[in-house]
Curated annotation (Swiss-Prot):
Residues 437-446, 496-508 have a biased composition (Basic and acidic residues). Belongs to the RIPOR family. The modification Phosphoserine is found at S9, S24, S340, S351, S384. The modification Phosphothreonine is found at T345. The lineage of its organism: Eukaryota, Metazoa, Chordata, Craniata, Vertebrata. It comes from Homo sapiens. Keywords: Phosphoprotein. Residues 390-512 are annotated as: Disordered. Residues 478-495 have a biased composition (Polar residues). This is RIPOR family member 3.
Amino acid sequence: MSVRLRFLSPGDTGAVGVVGRSASFAGFSSAQSRRIAKSINRNSVRSRMPAKSSKMYGTLRKGSVCADPKPQQVKKIFEALKRGLKEYLCVQQAELDHLSGRHKDTRRNSRLAFYYDLDKQTRCVERHIRKMEFHISKVDELYEDYCIQCRLRDGASSMQRAFARCPPSRAARESLQELGRSLHECAEDMWLIEGALEVHLGEFHIRMKGLVGYARLCPGDHYEVLMRLGRQRWKLKGRIESDDSQTWDEEEKAFIPTLHENLDIKVTELRGLGSLAVGAVTCDIADFFTTRPQVIVVDITELGTIKLQLEVQWNPFDTESFLVSPSPTGKFSMGSRKGSLYNWTPPSTPSFRERYYLSVLQQPTQQALLLGGPRATSILSYLSDSDLRGPSLRSQSQELPEMDSFSSEDPRDTETSTSASTSDVGFLPLTFGPHASIEEEAREDPLPPGLLPEMAHLSGGPFAEQPGWRNLGGESPSLPQGSLFHSGTASSSQNGHEEGATGDREDGPGVALEGPLQEVLELLRPTDSTQPQLRELEYQVLGFRDRLKPCRARQEHTSAESLMECILESFAFLNADFALDELSLFGGSQGLRKDRPLPPPSSLKASSRELTAGAPELDVLLMVHLQVCKALLQKLASPNLSRLVQECLLEEVAQQKHVLETLSVLDFEKVGKATSIEEIIPQASRTKGCLKLWRGCTGPGRVLSCPATTLLNQLKKTFQHRVRGKYPGQLEIACRRLLEQVVSCGGLLPGAGLPEEQIITWFQFHSYLQRQSVSDLEKHFTQLTKEVTLIEELHCAGQAKVVRKLQGKRLGQLQPLPQTLRAWALLQLDGTPRVCRAASARLAGAVRNRSFREKALLFYTNALAENDARLQQAACLALKHLKGIESIDQTASLCQSDLEAVRAAARETTLSFGEKGRLAFEKMDKLCSEQREVFCQEADVEITIF
């Protein structure tokens, strides 16, 4: 069932259009067909690279909802994994035996090169066997802990069922509550162990082998294959050619296996402007944990008229481990590596012609280093700068012309070449596989338009960066973590003063962004992916994460002597300590000094260092708004959240996404030199009254944020002449209330006070002004002071007179503050009968004020989840008068409260909502009755606990 396949490189898909449709219903146009024929002959290294999926361990994340553990599924995957690991270990042991036997039979030649390389390969396999044995022991330990927790959970569940059949008593209820907590803890432990076990499942490399059909596959047909494994997806498109061959846009994809997800495959036939679903099938991943690559044929249709051929290859370790350790199932098989090693001839000393060619290649590099200009791309860049460049700079220079190889023979002859370097230039980027896969991932899942700003491509050489934030991610919105998007790095080599300033910034105490970024992403993953606000926020945060760099990561410059020394010592292969992958890639002829170890992947570097944007102002802004996003997402994950509160939270999430999008297009070199906010954000000039206040809080170089205490003092200084005389003693309180509203997103988030280290950004302040529709800040502050005074009056004598004024124009002037709504609601319980009637009547009359009602509903719905029983009771009564049917589910849930007063208020409010309220109350009453019946069943059962 062989199928002739052609795969298009990512660079060719733009011209080919992958499987694009023409304007007519005829499918491909003739021009597109001609472009396909031209692009087939191109061979891109990147198309041969596996597109590595982003790691999405579905259970090992904070803030996600703990699902019910599935021990049988975990047992099945564990047994398959253990079987595959043992098989893998046997293969490694057989390889070691073969190398040991060959080591004994090898005679030492004059150069000793082959003998030493064979010895290195033997030690490498031994290290890999030890690593595999540790891997197996770790998996066994995790599963043993999982089984213990499973038995504890089963025992607690049995005891809970037994106690449920006991006569109802206080002791039985307490025991049931304790058992419920134990059950929850055991389930959480099992869930965490499942997440830890998923990390050890390795990777599946799935390669497309083509569609097989009989009468169904016709020339010109377009097909789309979609594969899903949990949250990971791979969509590829193909076309049936006239010679019965098939053209597909991708060849291989790496998936991270999970414990509870299987591989779903869906095939769709593209017809003109429509599509027809051919079939869908699900494959059990437990069958994929085998050492050797296996070709599977999947029946897409029920009758088997169309089959899909796939090659599945399992790697017990991830790609990063694969790059630094041997693996028989890697991109280069063990057989090919043995062939390249055993048939290898020790290289001779470089000839005069080769040394001359090296010196010619080195001259422009030396000049570029001395002059500080951009360097020409050559293979020497990979040899000399592999540990000096950032990963993004390496990825920019991966596409090398074939003439840059300084091999004097055919580069394809990698096994018998005796030149200075026997490795093909096209294979060099394979050493940097993770970065290439990240770029392919960015191409595979492009961001929707408008989420991230359009990045202008860099002009000139790969190092000729323009200052500013807009050009720092020039190639793609999703770049590797080494992408330097701070403005000082590119220009620091040309201006000593700027270099010193940048160095001072980076060496000083900064803001750590790695933790907040990961926390926000972990909170975003378990959320509802159908919400566009959350999806767009995730894309925006991912864009920032991929462009952050490790702290103090600077470009180092080497002299001409060190560059020459690096080149000459690349032939010191006898002293090199190479991993097997690098040895096979370079043919054993390239080496590094022992004191110049191979640089680790960028992902390992980034993980061991804190990430920074390179500009202190940007770090502060990102930190503040990431903390706001974290608080919003935590509240979104709360149980029994009302739809009203959820919509308000999603609106604020969209606002934070807009702020991050604005930050991504700012020129932060300009920010560092700005003296006023209008220079950075011209739209800020529309709020002239607020700008004067903000200018008093900021200074040159830091115009987008200020400490909360500074803004507090500036507010006092600005408004003291209007407030002190008319409202004595209210200035401090009014200023603090305003800042609390700014920080808590208008009362949406719980207030955490105003510590001195709290930072307030311009975007938070401007968002507050927009939310309150402030055109005159002085007038707004006066109304806020009146409301603060009103709160005090509601706690003093003469409350009835004050409450009666809460109507009409006076009601419309209120924000209202959370303190106002709280005091108003509590008057229904704590006041005199006359005051209670007045407070209830004014709340009922406030229904006509739409703005007030929305804010009041939001506050009182949040109050239902508080631990204050008096506030819960008052909130229920307030929702009754406001006709808050939007919160009917939250109100009905309080009908099961332990306190009679809260239950009565919740029952009264729920039944006041008409037919919907009656149905909700009956539903809750039915649940209560079922629970009571469970307690009363089999009352004669006696339980003895030792």
